[in-house]
Amino acid sequence: MIANLTRAGMLGVAGWALVTPAVAQNARSASVEVMTDEVRRGLSWTEGRVAAAGDVRVSLGPIDASARAVTTRGSARHDGADAVVDLVVGTGWDLGAVRIRTDAIGHAFAGARGRMDYVEGAVSASYAYGPVYATLGATAAPSQRAIGGSNVYLYASANAGIPGTPLTILGELGHSTGSVSDPVRAERLRPGGSYTNWRLGLEHRRDRLTLGVDYVGTDVDRTGDANRFTDRGNVADRVLGRVQISF
């Protein structure tokens, strides 16, 4: 366990090394967060258990970068990994009233029994209308052994401040699909094949503190066949809580 946590720490330091050259003059934000479950695209990355995360975001001219380290607590989905570090480098520009953004994303796992790392590319278009901020996007992972093929995630999301309150409502609807080269490993990101996920959340922000509650779910069949990378017990509708402090 100590060796696994040490590797996770080294990955985190590597992530910081990518972004810290700009910290002194271009720091955007850093935060720590605790959540009842680390859920991505409706799938638990911690087998339904509490997780902790820390991240930093910086910019240098038109380029920005971030590093986020999250505990995964021996997740079967990621072959027993204790933590993951997400490294993102991207840029954005305005096309009229629409904000276009592109990102290159790497996911590095610490403590897994095998090589679980994989990469993705993302593009999105966002538009603000009054208090509503809406986004359409796609995230694609080319075919890789770690995920048993390719993976494409299409989504629509929106958030809006509730007038007269410190509350923000959030929503997202997404769909995952892709090719399969290894049916066992493909279960990591697409259990049972292509599926749809949803999220409806509410946030309260006060200074540096953010409190959030989310209702999330998927249409994944919980009774389907399981394998070493499947965690079908944590794909159903559920309510999550999270607390974040920004610096």
Report each predicted region and the residues it spans.
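Outer-membrane beta-barrel "beta-signal"
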Residues: L200, H204-D207, Y215, G233-F247
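Glycine- and aromatic-enriched membrane insertion/assembly motifs of diderm outer-membrane
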Residues: E47-T102
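Detector for outer-membrane/organellar transmembrane beta-barrel domains
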Residues: Y118-R190
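Cleavable N-terminal export/targeting peptides
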Residues: M1-A27, F247
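Outer-membrane beta-barrel translocator domains and adjoining extracellular loop/strand segments
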Residues: G42-E47, A76-A83, A112-V119, R145-N151, ...
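Transmembrane beta-strands of outer-membrane beta-barrel pores
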Residues: V34-R40, L60-P62, A69-S75, G106-A110, ...
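Residues that define the transmembrane beta-barrel architecture of outer-membrane proteins
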Residues: N26, G48-A52, A81-V85, V98, ...
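Transmembrane beta-strands of outer-membrane beta-barrel proteins
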Residues: R28-V32, G54, I63-A67, L87, ...
